[in-house]
UniProtKB/Swiss-Prot annotation:
This is 5-oxoprolinase subunit A. InterPro entries: Glyco_hydro/deAcase_b/a-brl, LamB/YcsF/PxpA-like. One of its GO terms (molecular function) is 5-oxoprolinase (ATP-hydrolyzing) activity. The gene is pxpA. SUPFAM superfamilies: Glycoside hydrolase/deacetylase (SSF88713). Its EC number is 3.5.2.9. The lineage of its organism: Bacteria, Bacillati, Bacillota, Bacilli, Bacillales. GO terms for biological process: carbohydrate metabolic process. Belongs to the LamB/PxpA family. Catalyzes the cleavage of 5-oxoproline to form L-glutamate coupled to the hydrolysis of ATP to ADP and inorganic phosphate. It is an enzyme of class 3 (hydrolase). It comes from the Bacteria. It comes from Bacillus velezensis (strain DSM 23117 / BGSC 10A6 / LMG 26770 / FZB42) (Bacillus amyloliquefaciens subsp. plantarum). It holds the Pfam family LamB_YcsF.
Length: 254
């Protein structure tokens, strides 16, 4: 039977600003990537999101990003590998405190936004991020774009890696995501998104913007929790994957 983990970026509210429907989305995912205060989130939101995920039995991962609240961590900022190591380790450590207080374990680490995309193509940054994860806990799973430099770096260092695919994003011919600045970067149609996920899981391919079949590996699929139709999207994805005989379950650290 085909199997997939469903993950979502959560805990991205901060201060007076509320982003996403975290409590509702948690009913439809198996892994939660919780913001650690740099691109979004704050200590109170981190604590509450950890507690919610733990209550619902959803696996928890750190979601470190660039220090860019105004740009939501989606703007590329030039950083050195040393800086990538430091900011990754710092944010994992911050979330870890709340997990320890709640009595639950961290499952994975998934970089956010621009940091994720930069690490996907930059060997130096990807190596630094993988090192930070490994030095914190070599038992953690490193999430990264399927076929990316980040996955390669994690594999080289001996980490368990999870190749990630996206339900609501279009792909380019080289297997990277279409930049959000492009008009067709996001998939708004639920049926098209579901069809893309089923293809990625069952056929290990995705159809690029130009109609080319691109090979990939799908261990976990990301759905975004900050969109206007995020909750409907989450419900539909889970329902249709089950109907397609795809088992939905969290990854194992073993």
């Amino acid at each position: 039977m085909f199997q997939i983990d469903i993950n979502c970026d959560l805990g991205e509210s901060f201060g007076a600003y509320k982003i996403g429907l975290d409590e509702e989305i948690l009913d439809y995912v198996t892994s939660a990537n919780i913001a650690c205060g740099f691109h979004a989130g704050d200590p109170s939101v981190m604590r509450k999101t950890v507690a919610l995920a733990a209550e619902k039995g959803v696996k928890i991962g750190a979601h470190p990003g660039l220090f860019d609240l105004q740009g939501f961590g989606r703007r590329q900022i030039a950083i050195t590998p040393e800086e990538a190591y430091d900011l990754t380790l710092y944010q994992i450590g911050a979330l870890s405190g709340f997990l320890k207080a709640e009595g639950v374990e961290m499952q994975h680490v998934k970089p956010h936004g621009a940091l994720y995309n930069m690490a996907a193509v930059n060997p130096g940054l990807s190596e630094a991020i993988a090192q930070a994860v490994c030095h914190f806990d070599p038992g953690l799973i490193l999430f990264g774009l399927s076929g990316s430099e980040l996955i390669k770096a994690g594999d080289r260092i001996g980490l368990r890696t999870a190749s990630e695919v996206f339900a609501d994003r279009t792909y380019q011919e080289d297997g990277t995501l279409t930049p959000r600045s492009e008009p067709d970067a996001l998939i708004q149609d639920d049926k098209k998104a579901v069809g893309q996920v089923i293809q990625m899981v069952k056929d290990s391919t995705v159809t690029s913007r130009k109609g080319q079949a691109v090979s990939l590996k799908a261990d976990t699929v990301c759905i975004h929790g900050d969109g206007a139709h995020a909750l409907t999207f989450a419900k539909t994805i889970k329902k249709e994957l089950k109907a397609a005989d795809i088992q939905i379950s969290a990854l194992s650290k073993d």
